[in-house]
């Protein structure tokens, strides 16, 4: 019995394909969110501007940290789903797939830990304006640097996933071409055998007729 379309990802291979696209989409979403903070980070880390630049960055992160709880839970849910997708990919990986899936999982796990341990608490400190460990300007610069590190790790995840997809498609094309070549060879050999068989039968028929005429 054929599977219905809604259950086309029910088998192991289909589940891993769905997880691969889930990793790509969720990682790209998180990367885009963090990259948006560059509007504030560029003037606090890469080219530190006047005091007004740090005031603007503080206002920006205060607004981000004070986002509606639905927005926060949505982002955290996507982060959690990304980890689940990675685990689905890595489970039962064999051969060269281990290198791709384990590396991607390690990079994302590192980025997730860095975000939970450093980025999220730092934004909360900005919201509360409770600068204890560092002065305000230094704190904002460290927060910007943490954002950059997380973005680099997520970019690595995206590149690994895209590299695997590219390699998978190239391998599929090569396997399809190899299968077509083998099919053509089999057809050629079959035609050759049929031709030889027909020639043999023709020779035997001629020989039989010659013997009959002699008799």
Curated annotation (Swiss-Prot):
Domain of life: Eukaryota
Transmembrane segments: 22-42, 68-88, 106-126, 148-168
GO molecular function, one term: unfolded protein binding
Pfam families: SHR3_chaperone
Residues covered by region (Disordered): 190-215
A biological-process GO annotation: protein insertion into ER membrane
Family assignment from sequence similarity: To yeast SHR3.
Subunit annotation: Monomer.
Record function comment: Involved in amino acid permease processing and required for the efficient translocation of structurally related amino acid permeases from the endoplasmic reticulum to the plasma membrane.
The protein's name in its UniProt record: Secretory component protein psh3
Organism of this sequence: Schizosaccharomyces pombe (strain 972 / ATCC 24843) (Fission yeast)
Gene from which the chain derives: psh3
């Amino acid at each position: 019995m054929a599977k219905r379309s809604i259950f086309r990802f029910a088998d192991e291979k289909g589940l891993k394909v769905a997880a691969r696209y889930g990793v790509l989409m969720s990682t790209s979403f998180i990367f885009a969110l963090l990259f948006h903070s560059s509007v504030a980070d560029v003037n606090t880390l890469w080219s530190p501007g006047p005091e007004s630049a740090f005031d603007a960055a503080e206002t920006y992160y205060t607004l981000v940290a004070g986002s509606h709880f639905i927005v926060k839970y949505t982002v955290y849910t996507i982060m959690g789903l990304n980890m689940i997708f990675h685990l689905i990919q890595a489970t039962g990986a064999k051969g060269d797939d281990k290198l791709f899936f384990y590396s991607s999982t390690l990079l994302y796990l590192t980025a997730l830990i860095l975000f939970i341990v450093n980025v999220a608490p730092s934004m909360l400190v900005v919201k509360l304006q409770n600068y204890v460990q560092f002065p305000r300007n230094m704190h904002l610069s460290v927060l910007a640097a943490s954002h950059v590190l997380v973005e680099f790790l997520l970019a690595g995840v995206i590149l690994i996933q895209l590299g695997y997809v590219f390699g998978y498609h190239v391998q599929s094309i090569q396997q399809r071409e190899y299968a077509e070549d083998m099919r053509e060879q089999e057809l050629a050999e079959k035609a050759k055998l049929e031709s030889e068989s027909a020639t043999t039968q023709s020779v035997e028929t001629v020989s039989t007729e010659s013997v009959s005429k002699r008799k």
